[in-house]
Amino acid sequence: MSRTLSIKERRTVKKILFFIGLTIILTINYMYNFMDSQNNAFNDFQADSETLVTGIIFADCRELDNMQYGLGRYYTKSGPLMSRYGTNYTYLTDENWTLGYSNYTAQLIFDKNYYTQTYAVEGNFIKFATGEIFPIISSMEDDEYLVVSLASDEPLNVSQYGSLSETAFLDQEGRKLPDSAVEIYKSQYGLQGKVFRFMANSLGMEIQEGDKTVYHLICSLLTGLTFVMLVWLIRIKYGNLLASCFYITFLLSPWVVNFAKNLYWVEFTWFIPMLVGLFCSIYIDNKKWRAISYIAAYTSILIKSLCGYEYISTIMLGMTSFLVTDIIYMLISHTDKRKIGIAFRTFFLTSLFALAGFITAFIIHAYYRGEGIWQGIQYIILEDAIRRTRGIDNTVDVSLWYVLGRYFQFQTEIITGIPGNLFVIICTIPICIFIYEYVTGKINWKDVILYGVFFLTSISWFCLAKNHAYVHTHMNYVLWYFGYIQICIYVIVKRFAKFCKGKA
C-alpha cells in the first residue's frame, strides 16, 4: 500500500528533479548549441585537437602499435584523420599534375605528413593497383607536399596505374608496409585518450564513420553535471543570485559551450578542482570532510594534469579561490583567530595536496617521455614546458600589458545577447560600484574580495604563459569564465536589484 510522501521528502524529490533538469539543459546545449545560433565556431571548434584522441582510437583498433601514450595523430598517404571522416581526398591536379601523377616525369605527389615522410622514402617501393612495382629513388618535400621520384623512364598516369589511394608502400625487402601510421603526441600523458580507447575496445564503442556522438554525450554530460554541482554548492554558500549568475554564464557562454564536448579538452576536468575547493570551504569545520577534500584535491589535479597541463595555474588557483576569499575576509573582519588558523591550515594542505597531484602526474609523464624519469623531466621542461609558456616562436617577446589588452577585446559575445565590446564596461562597472560604496560607507568586502581573487585567477595563465597566450587567442578567452565574468555580472545585477527596491 502506497504512502503519501512527507513534506520533507517532497522537497527532496523536487530538489533532485530540479538538479536533473538543470543538468539535462546544460548537456543538451553542450551537445547541440540550441541557445546560440550565432556561434558559428561550435561545430568544428578545436577539431584538430580532438583528432589526437580519435586518432589514437583508430590506430589502436587497427593494432598499429601497443602505445603507452594516450594521444596521437592518425595518418594515411592522403593526410591526417580530421574532424569529418569519409571525405574523399583529391590528389593534386594542375598544369603539372593530374590526380597526383606528374604530367612530364616519373613522379608522384602526396600530402606531406608523418605517414608519407616515414614510408615514401628512398629505397622503398610503391605498388600500384595493377600490381606493378616501382622503386623509389628519391623524395623531396615542400611546405605542403612530398614529391616521390620513381625508377621509370616514362611518366606514369592514372588511367594506366589507377588511383594513388589504391597504392601501397613496400620496404626494401618487398614486404608490405602499413596503410597508416600514428604520430604519438608526447607533450602530455594523454589520460583522456587512454580512457576513450578503453571504451572503444572493451565496451564496443569504436567510432563508426566519424560518429562521435556517444563520446560527445559523455563529455557534455560530465561537464554539465560538474557545473550543476558547482552551482549547487555556490547556492549553499552564497545564495541564489550568485548561483544563478554562474549557471546562466555556463549555459550561455560561447566559449564554455564550445569546449564542453571536446574529447581532447575534457572541460569538466578543469572545474572539478574548483568544485573540490568550494566544498572544502563550506565544510571547513568538519575534519572528516576536510580530509576527504585533500584527497579529492590530489586526485582531481592528478587527473587534470594527466589529461594535459594547459591552464593549470588558473585551475589550481580556482581550486583555492573560495578558501582565499574566506581567509582575506576573516582577516579584514577580525574573525576569531582559531577559525583563521583552521582556514590557513586548510588552504595550505589543499594547495600541498594539489601540488603533489601535479608532481605525480609530471613524474608519470616523465617516465614515458624519456629513458628514465630524469631524462624525461629534461625533455618535458626543455621541449614542452618552455614551448607552452613562451609560445611556438621563442623569438617573439611581447609585453604582459599587450597580452592582457588583447584579452579585454572580445571577438565573440560574452554570453548570448551581450556583445563582446561591452566586456571592458562590464569589468569596470563593479569597480565603480565598489568605489561609490566605499565612499558612502556601504562597502561589501566579500564582493570586493571575490572580484579581486577571481580576476587574478583568470589572468594567471596569461601572466605565466604570456607568449603562448599571445598566440592562442582563438581559445584562451575561456579563462575569463573561471568565475570572473560570473562575479562581474553578479555585482552588477545585485546592485541593480537593490536600486530597483530603493535600497541603493
Residue ranges of each PLM-predicted region?
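Membrane-lumen/periplasm interface segments of specific transmembrane helices
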Residues: 346-426
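Aromatic- and kink-enriched transmembrane "portal" helix at the membrane-lumen/periplasm boundary
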Residues: 208-216, 246-271, 301-302, 306, ...
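Membrane-interface alpha helices of multi-pass inner-membrane proteins
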Residues: 293-311, 315
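Transmembrane-helix motifs of polytopic, lipid-linked glycan transferases
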Residues: 214-243, 433-439
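Short hydrophobic/aromatic helix or loop-helix immediately within or flanking a transmembrane segment
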Residues: 175-213
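Transmembrane alpha-helix segments characteristic
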Residues: 245, 442-467
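Hydrophobic/aromatic-rich transmembrane helices and adjacent perimembrane loops
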Residues: 266-272, 471-498
